[in-house]
Amino acid sequence: MSLVTMREILPYAEEKKIAIPAFNIDTMEITQAILETVEEENCPAIIAVGQAAIKDGKLESLAATVRTLAKDMKTPVVLHLDHGQSVEQVVKALCAGFTSVMIDGSKLPFEDNIAVTQEVVRIANAAGASVEAELGAILGSEDNISHDDSKPFLVCVQDVIDFTAAVKVDALAVGIGNAHGLYKGCLLYTSD
């Protein structure tokens, strides 16, 4: 099976009442092991290339590896740009054959996040790819990207309603108190 978009795989997950795992990759060996396992288990998957791998110059080589290995698979696989940092990075991923892109405008002011996401949706839809956006923040550090712990990281429902009314994305990641990384002591969550 060729690669699919998130737009194709998420309705399948909803219909079957399953979760679709997402795996961040950074080497060809890890990629091969993941793809062999999802094929063996007949488990659709999202194969994501994150910012650490991109900073190491691996965007194109990892995309080529996934495309080559996925073409003979029966199990659907999404090739996904994780936490895309700019429109230019999204375009580079689409040119490398990604079927799904995330634009992470969560650090931007709300209206700027909407504007950049609308631009990415326009470009990605023209390329036949799906789009994920992000609202809020994830506490800590993910893929060598740190988030300011002083910024509120819980998204209010009205922001989600307003964002999805303005931008038609295929998936939306929202900060709901998630925390990544290692911490000394306990993380304190409030219900505020």
Per-segment meaning from a language model:
Residues 1-20:
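N-terminal amphipathic alpha-helix/helix-capping segment at the start of soluble metabolic enzymes
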Residues 3, 22-38, 80:
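N-terminal glycine-rich phosphate/pyrophosphate-binding loops that anchor nucleotide-derived ligands
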Residues 22, 26, 78-81, 101-109:
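Catalytic beta/alpha-barrel core
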Residues 84, 110-116:
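Glycine-rich anion/phosphate-binding loops
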Residues 9, 28-45, 64-68, 72, ...:
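Alpha/beta enzyme core
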Residues 51, 83-87:
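Short glycine-enriched loops at secondary-structure junctions
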Residues 189-192:
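Conserved small/polar residues in nucleotide/adenosyl-binding loops
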